[in-house]
From Swiss-Prot:
The lineage of its organism: Bacteria, Pseudomonadati, Pseudomonadota, Gammaproteobacteria, Enterobacterales. The FMN-N(5)-oxide reacts spontaneously with NADH to produce FMN. Requires the flavin reductase RutF to regenerate FMN in vivo. The gene is rutA. Its EC number is 1.14.99.46. This is Pyrimidine monooxygenase RutA. Gene3D superfamilies: Luciferase-like domain.
Amino acid sequence: MKIGVFVPIGNNGWLISTHAPQYMPTFELNKAIVQKAEHYHFDFALSMIKLRGFGGKTEFWDHNLESFTLMAGLAAVTSRIQIYATAATLTLPPAIVARMAATIDSISGGRFGVNLVTGWQKPEYEQMGIWPGDDYFSRRYDYLTEYVQVLRDLWGSGKSDFKGDFFTMDDCRVSPQPSVPMKVICAGQSDAGMAFSARYADFNFCFGKGVNTPTAFAPTAARMKQAAEQTGRDVGSYVLFMVIADETDDAARAKWEHYKAGADEEALSWLTEQSQKDTRSGTDTNVRQMADPTSAVNINMGTLVGSYASVARMLDEVATVPGAEGVLLTFDDFLSGIENFGERIQPLMQCRAHLPALTQEVA
């Protein structure tokens, strides 16, 4: 099973709590995180894109770096780990993304890929005057289909004459082209999102579900597997989890309860309000899960709370789910979390037993 790190491109990572570590996103922090992840044989690193935060006491995600420029920098200071940036497709023409991706492919030596997102939080785009109207919610995957067609043209042949409802290319050129086939990843959980991923993505991210219920996402992975069977493609699921680990189950649980007790209710109210704006994509979207009050303090990603041995056992359970090819991990404290994962958790995981011994110093 592949292991990735979801780097904290926004302040405070993924805990919306006054009791969680409070920090700003910087290149130096993310450099240390990704170099440490590479040392411990993580397979990939991904950064999101967020253009406006949730506010509140913690100013959650009010402070964010930009994904492509951050990952270009990280590509230059790593050598093996795969690097993925996220394109907010309403903000960037596909021809520009194609050229930026080809550039980072050159920087990384073929280790780069692109995560495509349609956008769900209206204020991110309204503040710039580029929100296309609420009809976009029902047409966003039509838009993304044209977008990826242009990308594929330019990466494949260096030229596009695509004509569609959203994009018109007229002998559009990109050169040099990527040195290897460019991977495209997505995070669709709605029916439309999964259908798109089944046609165009190399793999699809989905949320884990619940606390210490590592296989509860299985129905989502099964839906993705079924959608991919309809297209004859192999599109695996990569599952998002937060790891909160300590020496004992009780110590880890105490940390989790402490974070929940400090939940930033003002920021969470903003998230809930924004999740209700899209009335056209159904009830199974990512943002609907993020705003579920059950565990909104960490946007309802699957949460693995326990001793190092308990977390290792639960991750091995994840690997048994059909269609699950990897996990994307966040941590309450990224630097110590990755080190503890590499030293205390990963060596206990049967699904990672194939890894070579650690031989180099952490940067």
